[in-house]
Amino acid sequence: MKVIVDNKIPYIREAIEQIADEVIYAPGKDFTPELVQDADALIIRTRTRCDRSLLAGSKVKFIATATIGFDHIDTAYCREAGITWTNAPGCNSASVAQYIQSALFILQQTRGMKLNQMTIGIVGVGDVGSKVADVARKLGIQVMLNDL
């Protein structure tokens, strides 16, 4: 199996080289029809637009994006061409929750704010927002949610 991988994805080498026969690392902006022509799979980020102009006539059957969003993948073309794709929903949610927790502790330490007297508003209660809400509640913070 030949896989073309965006060279800016951290820690990918250890994982992919165990399962692929051939791996080529390239900057995401440098993926060309010639580069992907005989690849079986692509592992990308948002810098690589996966559409007909890149994929037509290639052997690509699988695309993985190391991102939450997938607007850089032409999903209609993939469906038409029989290409399976996946994204990484929630891949940064724990990090965001940890960052917010740290920021709240800094507010408490530098401004003397009491966490159990705070109210936090969260707009968007998907994977990230719900983890931030859980952290805030555990710290005794009143949480207000909006998910329209």
Predicted regions: what they are:
Residues 7-10, 27-30, 45-50, 68-70, ...:
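Short beta->alpha connector loops
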Residues 112-148:
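Rossmann-like dinucleotide/phosphate-binding beta-alpha-beta segment
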Residues 23, 84-85, 143:
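Hydrophobic beta-strand scaffold residues
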Residues 17, 79, 137:
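Anion (oxyanion) recognition and catalysis
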Residues 1-2, 61, 113, 117-118:
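Nucleotide donor/acceptor-binding cores
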Residues 1-39:
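N-terminal glycine-/charge-rich "phosphate-binding" loop or analogous flexible N-terminal tail
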Residues 41-112:
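Phosphate/diphosphate ligand-binding glycine-rich loop within oxidoreductases
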